[in-house]
Design a protein with these regions (language model features):
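Conserved ATP-driven motor cores of ASCE-family P-loop NTPases powering translocation/secretion/packaging/pilus
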Residues: 166-171, 338-340, 344, 351-441
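P-loop NTPase motor domains
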Residues: 17, 28-82, 86-346, 430-452, ...
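Short acidic-hydrophobic sequence patches enriched in Asp/Glu that either
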Residues: 13, 17, 21-24, 28, ...
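Glycine- and small hydrophobic-rich membrane-insertion segments that are intrinsically disordered
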Residues: 1-43, 399-421, 483-485
Length: 486
């Protein structure tokens, strides 16, 4: 009987504990069931917090000479001590490249252009240098990957005819021509208006015939029907352009009857276009040529956006628009293209030699600040000007750091001092001024990250290796050099 009492007393003792554990377990199960959908929702979208100080670049990193030759890599990321795969790079966020002449900008552009073609994109390269080497490298790239191409050059044997005014409305043609010509800093508004009216009248008359026409047709009709003082500036600029070495290229068909090239046609074919307009050899005239093609690119972006609703179709036909020495050929309205081109699948790569080149476009620092907001990928190379280096260092950002000061007595440390917080550069201006040939600082946004990279030497790429002399001017379509590459 006593044993039964003991058993009951033990049961009475443990019963509240057991009930408490059961109740707590039920609460945990309930909470888990309530939280489970939230856990599922967050799977795959982890929230990563990056410590700003971990991105800091230091001067000693510039001594690293480690390289990578893998064509899948942009180069060797010194601060993370590993290759930087090109698949990490997002060209759809638009890319701004700034670097002094002779410090590896052309090599970087070639790496990015090859990546563009590897992504099965079209390619348009507006090059105010217009050099033989640039054209040869462009052809090598296209031949290796079996891509059709069109060349605009005053001296290249494969250069064809172009008709940049073909695929647009008359209003767009008027805007394109007027902003491409040089009217001076303070043009007479009356003369501008009269020139536009005459141009619109000529274009309307030519359009009514229902046949393709080119800049030569516009010039002839202007000279015949609107040759007066108010339009003399417009007619003179047409004459200088079309009588120049570039004039023979602005025709609706070449001497063999082959149709002229347009950016719309290249976009539909996924073909590549090289535009050579040497500002060194032709100054203002070459700038006019460059602006004509930049305007055509803007109109292509507009046409794609209004024609296609299917974002997948646009993505399939995306293209890279590369503009080297951009300060020579762009104008303030160019930012409209940069800000809106993502919806049309155009990835813009804008390269200049210095921060000041963009300021000169509109004679204002405001434009440069707008550029800061419009490009999410920044490649920064050598800058010799202290002010430019400081502005670019500021763009890279700062982080909050502790700074320690020590007190001294009679020239020796006293053991006393202060600790205070202050902001330090993630990339000090001295790094930008001291960067070596072939190195670049890559600033990316969303998420923000800073990399110091030894850019891969494109001469090691199979696409850019020298070919036999007989192949240098061979037709492209039948060549299949890319089949054996690794």
């Amino acid at each position: 009987m006593s044993s039964a009492k003991n058993s009951n007393s033990h049961g009475d003792f443990f019963t509240p504990l057991i009930e408490g554990f059961v109740e707590m377990f039920q609460v945990l199960i309930t909470k888990a069931v309530e939280s489970f959908p939230k856990l599922l929702k967050n799977i795959g979208t982890p929230q990563i917090t990056i410590n700003q100080s971990s991105m800091k670049l230091v001067l000693s990193m510039l001594d690293c000479e480690r390289q990578t030759v893998d064509q899948a890599h942009l180069g060797w990321a010194i601060n993370t001590n590993r290759p930087y795969p090109l698949e990490y790079f997002d060209p759809s966020k638009n890319t701004f490249i700034v670097g002094s002449s002779g410090w590896g900008k052309s090599n970087l552009l070639s790496v990015l252009q090859e990546n563009c073609i590897q992504r099965k994109q079209g390619l348009i390269f507006i090059d105010p240098k217009g050099s033989l080497e640039a054209i040869r490298n462009f052809k090598k790239l296209c031949r290796y990957y079996g891509r059709n191409y069109y060349i605009f050059s005053e001296f290249d044997k494969e250069a064809g005819s172009f008709n940049p005014i073909a695929d647009m409305t008359n209003s767009q043609r008027v805007s394109m021509i007027m902003r491409s010509f040089d009217w001076g800093k303070r043009p007479n508004q009356y003369y501008l208006n009269e020139a536009q009216k005459a141009l619109d009248d000529v274009l309307s008359s030519l359009t009514a015939k229902g046949e393709e026409f080119d800049l030569h047709d516009v010039y002839k009709k202007l000279k015949t029907e609107h040759n007066k003082e108010e339009t003399s500036g417009l007619i003179s600029q047409f004459q200088l352009l079309l009588n120049s070495d570039f004039g023979k290229l602005f025709k609706k068909a070449n001497e063999f009857g082959k149709p002229s090239a347009t950016m719309k046609k290249a976009w539909e074919e996924k073909a590549c276009i090289y535009i050579g307009c040497s500002t060194q050899g032709y100054s203002t005239l070459a700038k006019t040529v460059g602006k004509l093609f930049v305007s055509e690119a803007m109109n292509l972006s507009y046409w794609i956006g209004k024609t296609y609703e299917d974002s997948h179709k646009i993505k399939e036909n995306s293209l890279g628009l590369f503009i080297d020495e951009a300060g020579s050929v762009i104008y303030p309205d160019f930012l409209d293209l940069v800000n809106k081109c993502r919806s049309s699948g155009i990835n813009v790569y804008t390269a200049v030699q210095s921060y000041s080149d963009i300021e000169m476009v509109a004679d204002s620092e405001i434009l440069m600040k707008q550029f800061f907001e419009s490009y999410s990928n920044w490649f920064i190379q050598k800058q010799t000007n202290t002010e430019n280096a400081e502005k670019l260092a500021s763009a890279c950002g700062t982080f909050l750091a502790q700074k320690t000061t020590l007190a001294t007595e009679s020239g020796s440390e006293s053991g006393k001092g202060t600790i205070r917080e202050g902001y330090e550069y993630l990339c000090h201006p001295d790094i930008i001024k001291s960067i070596n040939v072939g190195q670049t600082i890559l600033l990316e946004h969303n998420p923000k990250w800073l990399s110091l990279i030894n850019v891969r030497d494109v001469r090691g790429s199979n696409a850019f290796k020298d070919v036999k002399e007989v192949d240098k001017s061979a037709p492209i379509a039948p060549i299949k050099k890319g089949l054996g590459r690794k």
